[in-house]
Amino acid sequence: MKKQGKYMLNKLPQLQYTLTPNSVNPAEAVDYINSHIENYYCETMSVDISYMNILDACRVSTLCSTQHYIKYPNGKITWKVSSDSVKEFNKDLELGNSEYIL
């Protein structure tokens, strides 16, 4: 008879790095970031979208923050953006998991 072992799942340590989407197309950037959220443990993450224009940055940060909130309700995303206008534009859509830095 084979003895069954007990296994515990441990959280992997959080890596500290900045994720930069490899596309200026906002739909592709959303897919890239959301894929990262789904496939990796990233309760706290940092994303650089400072190369995007204001409207694209608003779209990407809103859609991906929502996806991140669904998986990690207590998580946080730090968005590196090119303008304070992104934060102002998204303030009414905020879920409490986003921080914007210049």
Across the structure, where does each feature detected by a protein language model lie?
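STAS-like cytosolic regulatory interaction modules
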Residues: 1-58, 64-102
